[in-house]
């Protein structure tokens, strides 16, 4: 994400130093069991858990109508591919201003959370912080509507309601669409 801001040479240096520092700090935790358990956890995260997932639930519903196969088993790789392509697109498109970097991080994280299989309410905190430095308010709406996800918890289990998810995500998507459309309209009028 820092490529346009720092340039190729400084970016490579920055990432090498960052990875090197984390690798050194990580040495005390190195063990075969750690890697085995960590990879198992990541595998579970992307291929077993489902909670408060907007786009994923919609795709799952469409897939159930068409062929009935389980989408969750392939969702991990789909999320990685989509977020990687989105990041590459934004890196190429972005200007070299710091405000643009924060906006790009906001778009990458938002895209990830929109297609993720699991979105707990506290995940949006980073988006909320980033949105303070942009003109976009859809994250603020999302932070208000996310409280509805707690309706899925009852005394013994977690059971999500489609109507609650629709009620939760419709205002967010409408606000995002309105903001994107109005900002595009402003750019067209300014030209």
Locate the predicted segments by residue.
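Perimembrane helix-loop-helix junctions
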Residues: 1-20
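Structural signal for the C-terminal ends of transmembrane alpha-helices
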Residues: 2-7, 88-95, 133-135, 177-185
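Transmembrane-lumen/periplasm boundary regions of multi-pass, lipid-linked membrane glycan transferases
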Residues: 20-45, 58, 126
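Aromatic-anchored segments of alpha-helical transmembrane domains
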Residues: 21-28, 108-116, 143-156
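Aromatic/glycine/proline-enriched transmembrane-helix motif characteristic
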Residues: 44-118
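Membrane-interface catalytic loops of GT-C/OST-like multi-pass glycosylation enzymes that act
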Residues: 116-127, 156-162
